[in-house]
Regions:
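Cleavable N-terminal export/targeting peptides
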Residues: 1-26, 170
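Generic detector of N-terminal low-structure segments
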Residues: 8-10, 145, 160
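Short glycine/proline- and aromatic-enriched beta-strand/turn motifs that initiate or cap beta-hairpins
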Residues: 21-66, 167-169
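Extracytoplasmic loops and strand-loop junctions of Gram-negative outer membrane beta-barrel proteins
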Residues: 27-32, 75-78, 113, 146-147
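Solvent-exposed loop/turn segments connecting transmembrane beta-strands
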Residues: 32-45, 85-87, 115-126, 150-159
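Gram-negative (and chloroplast) outer-membrane scaffold detector with strong preference
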Residues: 49-129, 134-142, 168
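Generic short beta-strand segments
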Residues: 64, 146-149
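Outer-membrane beta-barrel "beta-signal"
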Residues: 93, 157-170
């Protein structure tokens, strides 16, 4: 009896662990991130992420970036100088190979390209960064990113910064 119970427990443990391993691959997420970029920039990203094996992922994203300036008349940032200084929006794709794995977390490089506009001309961008994700209950995840964007034909050629976000399971 004891031997059968022991074999049953081992079988259940293997079944449950394989189910959890299967749950972490081929999962889709809707991501939302907000960040601050040097110098005087804010960034918001809405993306769809398809996770493949071993936490590698493909991300399809929409990105908006706003750069504010001091109002020359007031001497500080005003509503007008914040919202109407410089704005870009991009649509792009990023491949995210996993480089760090842990029990409830993993880290990915983020390599991507995008194209968009700054409301006056077409711009292109190359994206490189690191993203670290922490798993929560029910498939929810939170993450932070360190990002570097190289923008072609934009007002600011290099953007670097940090973003925080959440991943909602689909």
């Amino acid at each position: 009896m004891r031997k059968k119970l022991f074999l049953f427990a081992i079988t259940m443990a293997c079944t449950v662990s394989s189910a959890f391993a299967q749950m972490s691959s081929n999962v889709n997420h809707l991501n939302f991130a907000v960040g601050a970029l040097y110098e005087r920039g804010l960034d918001a990203t809405l993306s769809y992420e398809h996770e493949t094996r071993y936490h590698h992922a493909w991300e399809y994203f929409l990105n908006g970036y706003i750069k504010w300036a001091d109002d020359p008349d007031a001497g500080h940032v005003t509503r007008q100088s914040f919202w109407h200084n410089y704005f870009t929006y991009n649509i792009g794709i990023a491949y995210k190979p996993c480089v760090v794995r842990g029990r409830n977390h993993h880290g990915n490089l983020r390599i991507g390209i995008s194209g968009g506009s700054d409301t006056e001309k077409i711009i292109g961008a190359a994206h490189l960064g690191y993203e670290h994700t922490y798993a929560l209950r029910n498939g929810f995840q939170v993450f932070w990113q360190i990002k570097e964007d190289v923008v072609l034909r934009g007002e600011d050629q290099f953007r670097t910064g940090v973003a925080l976000g959440v991943k909602l399971p689909l």
